[in-house]
Curated annotation (Swiss-Prot):
This is Putative regulatory protein Pmob_0099. HAMAP family: RemA. The lineage of its organism: Bacteria, Thermotogati, Thermotogota, Thermotogae, Petrotogales. InterPro entries: RemA-like. It holds the Pfam family RemA-like. It comes from the Bacteria. Belongs to the RemA family.
Length: 95
């Protein structure tokens, strides 16, 4: 129930499909990027800028973003709270 999340440069992901947002600095994540690239599941949406976060989806896709993981996480939380506000309003109207 996270809606659509802006991950920078006009790129959007479906929040409910994301399973992890991680920093790309560790060696295991660098290997994960290579594997995703070999499988055709790497999406680079950083417009040539330094990759600051990998977004891993439930379909096995790895999305490289130039936005910090903390910023993307904050966007997730804000979307969640916004959706909850709307749902609370609807619940009150129904009852």
């Amino acid at each position: 129930m996270y809606g659509l999340i802006n991950i920078g440069f006009g790129n959007i992901v479906v929040g409910d499909r994301v399973i992890a947002i991680v920093s790309p600095t560790s060696q295991p994540l660098k290997r994960l990027k290579e594997i995703a690239e070999q499988q055709g599941k790497l999406l680079e949406v950083n417009h040539g800028r330094k990759t600051r976060a990998f977004i891993i989806t439930d379909s096995g896709h790895v999305i490289a973003s130039a936005i910090q993981p903390e910023t993307i996480t904050n966007r997730f939380l804000q979307n969640y709270y916004d959706i909850e506000k709307v749902l609370d309003k609807i619940r009150k109207e129904v009852l």
